[in-house]
Amino acid sequence: MRILITGAAGFIGQQLLADLAVQQPNWTLFAADIREIPANLLRGNVHPLLLDISRRAAVLKAVAECQPQAIVHLASVVSPPPGMSEASLHAIDVDGTQAVVDAAAAHGVEQLIITSSGAAYGYYPENAEWIDEHDPLRGHNKFAYARHKREVEELLVQARITH
């Protein structure tokens, strides 16, 4: 199995990479991130890949070259560094996800896993205590991550129709 993991240097990405590298030693894992992958995660079946998810052409090229059977898309910005623009955040969170979806479709990727968040539903006091996929996606205007997760959910609905 060949797996491309975006956001592999992030918290969830590191955990997933560490577990898969040990539990599935015969799998080829492409650890993609704009940041360096920690050395302790670079086992024999892990191949680091410097990838800026906001660069559509780079995403398409990475998927074409890696030829993954599955993609686990974790790349996102939860807590942006000071000074990061809204446009940069959107380019990573939303446009980057669209690029991954399009690359997966273009190159026949069998499985595409994209993480979501309760943030897509927005943080509102009137929300039910328990929410599920039938509740409205509202994001939150004051929290870019929540807005972007809502947008990603919407683009995934379109992707399911298109692909």
Which residues fall in each region the model found?
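NAD(P)H-binding glycine-rich loop region in Rossmannoid oxidoreductase-like domains
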Residues: 53-95, 103-106, 123
